[in-house]
Amino acid sequence: MVTDDRPAEELDVWFITDMVLCNFECPYCCAYKVITTKKVWHEQDSYDRFLRITERLTQVPYKLRMRMQTLGEPLVSKEFLERTGWLVSHDNISFIELVTNASLLSKRLKIITDNGGDLTKISLWATYHHTEIKMDKFLDEVQFAHDAGAFVVVNSLAFPDTIDTVEELYKKCAERGLRMNVDPGYKDGGGEYDEEGGALVPILEVPGGKERLYAMTANQNVLEANLRAADTVDGEECSAGGDYFIVLADGRVGPCCPLLSQGMQLGNMLDENYTLAPGKKKYSVCTVDRRTPILGHLPLVGDHFRRRWPCKNKEDFGHLKVIRENEVRSPSLGWFGG
């Protein structure tokens, strides 16, 4: 069933690279199998593939709204930042969003501008890691990037043992006029979603936890869609494969993370005969099998993160029609706060 035949003017792209160097050692890192302080790229040909894929992205005949994700920390790699500056300078790139721990923004953001990048086309998803950096230091780095012209969102996950810290961070962001996104932290190993979400989202098991989480959410509609999508997306309409695509480090292209996990590959960015283009329709009913591990396509992620949840990534469920039809578009694949 397809319900919308409007042509896409822009494409949303979630490009996951295998850059693995990081300056943090978070004990809960989902990429713990490969994260390292010793090398920049996971494989010998990773950087070459990265260059070729980004070259192909500049040739796509559509505007691209892109989250370019690393498994490590993007700010530690000079060559990654140089390429980011080069890539975002192209006319068909609406913005590039980087997922960062923010610790090096004041020292390294200049590399992007030195290589042709306009910071007003740079978006930063700055996640606070409370075990690795002091809150005020983190906020000073975020403030620097915000004042320099980048679109910045502070991000944090609410767990029972972090909720007090998250609330403190939320208050300080409000005082500074910074955007903040608070997502529910998921339980390791998965589990079925029940009526109250308690089997999936630990913060909802805590007395008053639901109220505290909802008080900080930037968009209640998105939060509720998040919890639904983690359980089932049966019957939900989505723009995955219409105007949203995932690109992996080896060039594979899929409609979204869950569908690519099921083997629905649309092409490969390393194939010169393939062109990334919108689907015939914007929306179609989701066909994700809830029994498929949604990260099964990504062997770099730890085994205990291979959860059998249909749709848990915000990049993916953010393209459900129930969200897309009500959202204010921003230069981010994760921010829906207006």
Roles of regions detected by a PLM:
Residues 28-29, 240, 285:
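Short, cysteine/histidine-rich loop/knuckle motifs that typically chelate Zn2+
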Residues 2-48:
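Canonical Radical SAM [4Fe-4S] cluster-binding loop centered on the CxxxCxxC motif
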Residues 19, 23, 235, 283:
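Residues immediately within or flanking Cys/His clusters that coordinate Zn2+
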